[in-house]
Amino acid sequence: MRIARSRCLRTSCPGMDEKEGCEKMMIFSTEGLEWTREPADYYIGADRIEITTQPHTDLWQRTYYHFRNDNAPVLQMETEERFFSFVVKTDFSGSGHRFDQCGIAMYLDSENWLKASVEYENESFQHLGSVVTNHGYSDWATTEIPADVRTMWYRLSRREDDYCIECSRDGKVFSQMRVCHMHEGGGRIRFGIYACSPEDSSFRAVFTDLQMTDCAWKAHDGQQPD
């Protein structure tokens, strides 16, 4: 995955703060993608990526459940860009077993990462949620959605070491899932996609419409700090 930039010659642009400057991220490709735990079955094409999950793969660290699961495949790029958004559409039509999931990830190391996905639960509902792991402890924020939802868009936005995760049903109107701080996410980072099946199951996760944009998460201009 590669980003090529065209820099505006103006010193500032409407809606951009001074630290951001004015950078247009133009070109997105799959060159430069790197696996953390390469799966046995996958496909990387010009317009889609497919991952067939393997049973008993997962990401979680310590909190509540006490186990440390760190074997899900993650496909990522590296960047030092401090302000950008990453968008992807996920199709998980083949999922049908508890905890089957696929979505976006920013995996720095086993104890510092985030992810967002839909986790299948049963024929009635599934969990749309996100996990943020800082210094070895995961949290999980979720909401229940109908089990017949089979696609979801995600947008991950970065503002230095702060991040915003959003989701969308149509790829046009995005809703905030969470805002978070990554203690180790202020410099060079890795981010991309993941898929896994924590129990004894497998499904094909399909990722399309991957794109980079200027940071869609604008600087805060509301209430001033005390």
Question: Where do the protein language model's features map onto the residues?
Answer:
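Extracellular glycan-recognition regions
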Residues: 22-226
